[in-house]
């Protein structure tokens, strides 16, 4: 379908193309209210991108909140579907404290969620759609993929204590190798305990170039099966037109209280920070009483404001 640039702006054009992409792959539009009961967010505040939430009291006396997140609302309002798959996409506004400005800001997201019998093929499709989403935004992009189970196995081998483990994971997310070594020294851990993790974090590149090394290293820590899942999830990119746009990078992390398995972030040249973020969140599903598996991602349209008109035009 042709899009008339005279009547819509760049963000609207990208949003239209993303929604069309997801519909073509069998995802159905999901619409939701602008607000939820505040308790949903207070119980899952560590899952949110920012701490602040706009609240108000409705006419029945309930404390409500303008939604700061989409995924929590979808998980809460959908039911498990044993033996089947729910494929949903959304175009919604969220209300968060912006890191670039004081106070709250309305931010637009387009994304998708896949819930139910999520298998390797489903994960591979979601990764492909994440890459295609970035390409619709700009040809100069990179999708970084990791596996939190593998990362967790390496960190567990260093520090079983949760507080130390979280500090190491935070450094891993920043690729702060000196910070990891410093934490190990401060907590009197075995000399060289962090060496394998540092080797893992140093493996950065296309799946073809780094997966053999990752699988070999993961086997030493009992994470061979998870390395196999990572390999299968990205195998479809090898030899294709997107191969050089996919990088394995274990600094793509998420909160292990909510996320598990595959995690990924998308970047576009000239824009600081990720414009796309996603991953598997089976742990969040369990926390909210759900049995389904789940994976999804969001594209942060407000981050694309810096793109020029030329960059936001489909090649």
Mark where each language-model region is.
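Extended alpha-helical scaffolds
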Residues: 137-140, 144-155, 161-164, 178
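General small-molecule cofactor/ligand-binding pocket signal
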Residues: 30, 144, 247-249
């Amino acid at each position: 379908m042709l899009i008339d640039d005279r009547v819509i702006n760049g963000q609207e054009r990208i949003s239209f193309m993303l929604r069309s992409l997801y519909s073509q792959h069998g995802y159905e539009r999901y619409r939701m209210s602008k607000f939820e009961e505040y308790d949903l967010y207070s119980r899952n505040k560590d899952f949110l991108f920012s701490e602040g939430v706009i609240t108000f009291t409705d006419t029945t006396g309930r404390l409500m909140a303008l939604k700061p997140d989409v995924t929590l609302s979808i998980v809460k309002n959908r039911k498990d579907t044993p033996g089947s798959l729910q494929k949903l996409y959304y175009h919604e506004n969220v209300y968060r404290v912006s890191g670039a400005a004081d106070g709250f800001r309305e931010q637009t997201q387009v994304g998708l969620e896949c819930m139910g019998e999520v298998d390797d093929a489903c994960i591979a499709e979601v990764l492909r759609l994440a890459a295609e989403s970035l390409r619709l935004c700009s040809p100069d992009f990179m999708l970084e993929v990791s596996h939190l189970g593998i990362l967790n196995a390496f960190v567990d081998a260093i520090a079983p204590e949760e507080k130390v483990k979280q500090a190491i994971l935070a450094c891993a997310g920043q690729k702060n190798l000196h910070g990891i070594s410093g934490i190990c020294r401060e907590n009197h851990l075995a000399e060289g305990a962090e060496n394998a993790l540092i080797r893992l974090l140093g493996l950065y590149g296309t799946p073809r170039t780094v997966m053999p090394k990752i699988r070999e290293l993961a086997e030493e820590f009992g994470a061979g099966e998870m390395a196999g899942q990572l390999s299968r999830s990205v195998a479809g990119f090898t030899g294709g037109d997107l191969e050089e746009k996919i990088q394995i990078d274990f600094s793509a992390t998420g909160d292990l209280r909510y996320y598990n398995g595959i995690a990924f972030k998308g970047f576009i040249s000239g824009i600081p920070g990720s414009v796309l973020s996603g991953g598997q969140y089976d742990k969040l599903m369990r926390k909210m009483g759900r049995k389904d598996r789940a994976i999804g991602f969001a594209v942060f349209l407000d981050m694309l404001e810096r793109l020029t008109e030329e960059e936001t035009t489909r090649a």
